[in-house]
Curated annotation (Swiss-Prot):
Signal peptide: none annotated. GO terms for cellular component: plasma membrane. It is a multi-pass membrane protein. It comes from Rickettsia massiliae (strain Mtu5). The keyword ATP-binding does not apply. This is Na(+)/H(+) antiporter NhaA. Na(+)/H(+) antiporter that extrudes sodium in exchange for external protons. InterPro entries: Na/H_antiporter_dom_sf, NhaA.
């Protein structure tokens, strides 16, 4: 190889590396990983030779000992109830940063994302209840269609980055985070098992310790990690979803200390983000998306009543999300209580509302703690995937149409 060819080769390698970095930074890569994880789960769960290995992998049992506490669990439970804590930690960190230092420091700019998120919760719930109000076994799944998968939405929008203004991106992030906040509150209030009062009191004491750490403006992450681990154990023992402790910890880590930005806060967010987006979420999707293809044709449904569950989720995600976001947002903009993001038409805003119906990861998470028996669980997962897929395809089509005119 000549010197000239070597230089050209190095330039090409550097160009590829730069493109990969940009791909990872844009959020597209996280969305691609989720699609790959989902595809692999469908393939292995429907392959006669691989399905037994898949099942033995996700349901393999082992015990975890922390101090005097011994937890016996399966791998899928460890991911859903343990590792997903980091997902909620990241949500909490991003939420706090955007409120204190980010785009939504100006509270007026928070009005539109807040009302859009509220509409995106209320209407999907009403639609789900319309189909399942007379089915006591299925009505408890009402929170499944309220979620929006931020990683997927941002991944899709990265392909339209030239047409997405900074204000519109800020709206999308704000809407997604507030939507996640509603999901967290609903999980804490309505999806709690039998309460263990002594463990709940211990959790309260630990949360008070977090308050003291915040009040004293302690910035060392070590203390928050230790206290957070104790909080997770006590919350699991109390019957409350232990994963929620991630968001609680994030709320108590100070963003600013004595008027200066706390670099430890951003350091934790930077460490958590790739771990969550490139490992935990793909692993969660892989372990929770393995269902037989017959469920997508509704041939595997156990009874006609399960169809109500399926319709409630699909219509809740696809119709409920877009309808709720638009119905709640329009009056606020019309009466000048807030403004649409800059360079954003109502059609473009509508395309974002449709993409809000991509529930996927968080919808699967809520569904996994709602339905444990295989019949409703498999139908629930198929419905979440179908509803999210329809929302993604239709949202992209509308967004492509309106950006094509710009």
């Amino acid at each position: 190889m000549t010197y000239y060819e070597l230089v050209i080769t190095n330039i090409k390698i550097m160009s590829i590396n730069n493109q990969l970095r940009e791909l990872i930074k844009s959020g597209t890569f996280a969305g691609i990983l989720l699609i790959i994880a989902f595809t692999l789960a469908i393939i292995v769960s429907n392959n006669i030779f691989l399905t037994k290995y898949y099942s033995s992998f996700i349901y393999s049992k082992f015990s975890l000992t922390i101090g005097n506490v011994r937890l016996q669990t399966t791998f899928i439970e460890l991911v859903n109830d343990g590792l997903m804590t980091f997902f909620f930690l990241l949500i909490g960190l991003e939420m706090k940063f955007h409120l204190v230092e980010g785009e939504h420091k100006n509270k007026k700019k928070l009005i539109l994302p807040a009302v859009a998120a509220l509409g995106g919760v209320v209407v999907p719930v009403l639609i789900y209840m319309f189909f399942n109000y007379d089915k006591p076994r299925l009505i408890k799944g009402w929170a499944i269609p309220i979620a929006t998968d931020t990683a997927f939405v941002l991944g899709i929008l990265s392909f339209f980055s030239r047409h997405i203004s900074l204000e519109l991106r800020a709206f999308i992030i704000g809407f997604s985070l507030i939507d996640d906040a509603f999901a967290l509150i609903i999980l804490a209030l309505f999806y709690t098992k039998t309460i263990n009062t002594p463990a709940l009191l211990i959790s309260s004491v630990i949360i008070f310790i977090l308050f003291i750490l915040n009040y004293r403006q302690v910035k060392q992450l070590f203390y928050y990690i230790i206290v957070g681990l104790l909080l997770w154990i006590s919350m699991v023992e109390s019957g409350i979803q232990g994963t929620l402790c991630g968001a609680i910890i994030a709320l108590f880590i100070p963003v600013n200390i004595k008027g200066e930005f706390n670099t430890s806060f951003k350091k934790l967010e930077n460490l958590t983000s790739p771990f969550v987006n490139y490992f935990i979420l793909p692993l969660f999707v892989f372990m929770n998306s393995g269902i037989l293809l017959e469920y997508f044709a509704f041939k595997g449904t156990c009874s006609n009543s399960i169809l109500a569950l399926i319709y409630g989720i699909i219509f809740g995600l696809f119709v409920g999300k877009q309808l709720g976001i638009m119905l709640f947002s329009y009056p606020f903009v019309k009466f000048k209580l807030c403004n649409l993001p800059s360079d954003t038409s109502w059609l473009k805003f509508y395309s974002i509302a449709i993409l809000g119906g991509i529930g996927f990861t968080l919808s699967l998470f809520i569904g996994s703690i709602t339905f444990e028996s295989s019949c409703p669980s498999n139908s629930m997962r198929a419905a979440v995937i179908i509803g999210s897929l329809i929302s993604a395809l239709f949202g992209v089509a509308v967004l492509k149409y309106c950006t094509g005119k710009e």
